[in-house]
Design a protein with these regions (language model features):
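Nuclease catalytic cores
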Residues: 1-32, 40
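Short phosphate-binding/catalytic loops that engage adenosine nucleotides
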Residues: 32-33, 155
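Conserved catalytic cores of phosphodiester-cleaving nucleases, focusing on short active-site segments
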Residues: 79-97
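Short, charged, amphipathic alpha-helix that recurs within catalytic cores of restriction-modification
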Residues: 103-122
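Domain-level recognition of nuclease-like catalytic cores that cleave nucleotide substrates
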Residues: 122-173
């Protein structure tokens, strides 16, 4: 199911993803995709670069960006993927839950975090998109307000789904 609670596991535009493995491993398991280091290849052509946690900051350093010049504390993304064709860094945060708890409040921080990533990447003229990949727990009615908020501040969410087409990545045949 995609954001807003509509649609379904549309394998023509994306892939079902349950967050049980990191994004690089997941992508490498898909038809015509390989991952070499941080490089994502589709049919042997580099289409993206994928980062997890501290690897994101290693990448920034290779680009001449000192994170401390822009933000006061590192944010460690679950997954970040820079898609070359649309010059966009997608921050993908996987959130799973099986009881009410701290993840509830974390969903409300996407606006702040997206702005922090924008500060880090503005010198590279990259766009930033912040996307939650949520499990079915968050389909409960008590999350309607927070899900509406996520959309209202320019962030996105999907349920158990990586929207390859939305990211600008080729969809496996």
């Amino acid at each position: 199911m995609i954001k807003g609670g509509t649609g379904g596991g549309n394998t023509k535009t994306g892939l079902i993803y349950e967050g049980k493995v990191d994004l690089a491993t997941f992508i490498a398991e898909q038809k015509n995709y390989t991952v070499e280091g941080n490089n994502v290849l589709y049919k042997d052509e580099c289409v993206a670069h994928v980062f997890k946690k501290h690897d994101f900051y290693k990448y920034l350093k290779t680009q001449g960006i000192n994170w401390q010049d822009h933000i006061s504390k590192q944010l460690l993304p679950d997954n970040a993927i820079y898609v070359i064709v649309n010059n966009t860094m997608f921050i993908l945060e996987v959130k799973t839950q099986n009881a009410a708890g701290s993840v509830d409040e974390k969903l409300q921080t996407c606006d702040f975090k997206k702005k922090q990533y924008q500060k880090l990447l503005f010198q590279l003229n990259m766009e930033v998109e912040y996307i939650y990949i949520l499990d079915d727990w968050f389909k409960k009615p008590q999350y309607k307000d927070v899900l509406d908020y996520i959309i209202s501040v320019g962030c996105q969410y999907y349920f158990n789904y990586v929207p390859l087409q939305k990211l600008g990545l080729p969809v496996p045949e």
